[in-house]
Amino acid sequence: MIYEPVTLFVEETPPATNMSVATTDPNPRVPQAERSARMRRRLAQAAYEVIRDTGYVNFRTAAVARTAGVSQGAQLHHFPTKNSLAQAAIDYAWSQATADSLARIAQFVPSDDVIATLMDDSQAFFFSDYFRVALDILMAGGNDRDLRDSLVASTLVHRSRVERLWLETLVEQGWRLPDAEDVLALSMSITRGFAVRALVEPGRERFERLCARWVAIVAQAGLGPTRAAPRASSTRAR
């Protein structure tokens, strides 16, 4: 998030007759835009936490104000409807999940097994509370076309960024683009499917075993690099 710079406005005072002492305001005023952005993020996080803890079917806007520690009037000023709060919760979840994935991608080095690392990142996302909350909103509020459309749009913005970076990482490691696209899509789909299954069948033991088998299948299929991967990690912008 980019904040506007804080500007201090100091009233001019007549020069002192003896000795003037320079003073600064110990409590500079924070610009309205920055205060508004902070409040919106605070409410978005609170909305996410309420849905995570109680489920979207029990989601009440009054609970968001209580969790955020603000008045309902302040909440309504920034998010006047339940849908706008739900959208804010989704945006918060996706931004946090995306930041986590970008950090994992940035830590990847060519000596790592790229498919195993991809599966680790995929598992961290699809088994997270972030994904569970988004899925809960989609399923419980799926009949609301506006909410569904905004959820899909937000998901595409954030997840396409992560998947694009993984695709670039595979290509940088020497993978052919068609193979990289197919393996990336299959890897994500496998993990997503098991994450949904985990909602009714707890435990990850089977998934972890099959995940390791998928990594081995990809290696045995000869779908890996067709050229030597670079030794140094990429300096491209994430």
Segments predicted by a language model, with ranges:
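Generic hydrophobic, amphipathic alpha-helix propensity
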Residues: S36-A47, V64, A89-A93, A97, ...
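Short helix-capping/turn signature of helix-turn-helix
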Residues: F79, A124, I137-N143
